[in-house]
């Protein structure tokens, strides 16, 4: 579950036996995407590049209401505290021609992630929606992207509020 203001609308909602995707969009075209990917074994979500790496800085900007618990008789409390993280691309490397990362002032996005994922990640997993997943009886991502890679101040405030409201439904 998550809350969102009236100026964000659901522009896509797809549910299958194993997957779910919900996309919120505002008038400028910024998006917030919730994705659940089931039917894929843990550790088997492939989407990486064989030649390109990306360096990403993940910084906690707010606490998340998401508190992991039991799903299908498995306890996920070991995932720990969740946060809303600002994710910024800070470097790229072509592994065929570069020997180190080339510094980049890249796109900013936001994601709900375990707090222990903050810091610097070097990855071949892109797009960021795939890279910013966590395992919770399936792959979960809750991310926000701006069409030009940068959010307005008002959008950033709304995005952080929406992402931080993500939580498990109480039964």
Where are the regions a protein language model picked out?
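Short, well-structured beta-strand
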Residues: 78-171
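Secretory pathway targeting signatures of secreted, lumenal, and periplasmic proteins
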Residues: 1-82, 88-90, 94
């Amino acid at each position: 579950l998550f809350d969102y203001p009236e100026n964000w609308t659901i522009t896509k909602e797809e549910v299958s036996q194993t997957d779910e995707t919900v996309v919120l969009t505002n008038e400028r075209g910024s998006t917030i995407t919730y994705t659940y990917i089931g039917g894929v074994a843990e550790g088997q979500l492939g989407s990486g590049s064989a030649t390109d790496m990306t360096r990403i800085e993940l910084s906690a900007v707010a606490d998340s209401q998401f508190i992991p618990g039991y799903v299908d008789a498995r306890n996920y409390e070991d995932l720990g505290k969740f946060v809303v993280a600002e994710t910024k691309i800070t470097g790229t490397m072509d592994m065929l021609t570069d020997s180190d990362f080339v510094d980049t002032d890249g796109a900013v996005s936001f994601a709900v992630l375990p707090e222990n994922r903050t810091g610097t990640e070097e990855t071949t997993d892109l797009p960021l929606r795939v890279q910013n997943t966590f395992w919770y009886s399936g792959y979960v991502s809750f991310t926000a992207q701006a069409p030009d890679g940068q959010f307005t101040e008002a959008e950033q405030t709304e995005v952080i509020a929406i992402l931080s409201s993500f939580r498990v439904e109480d039964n």
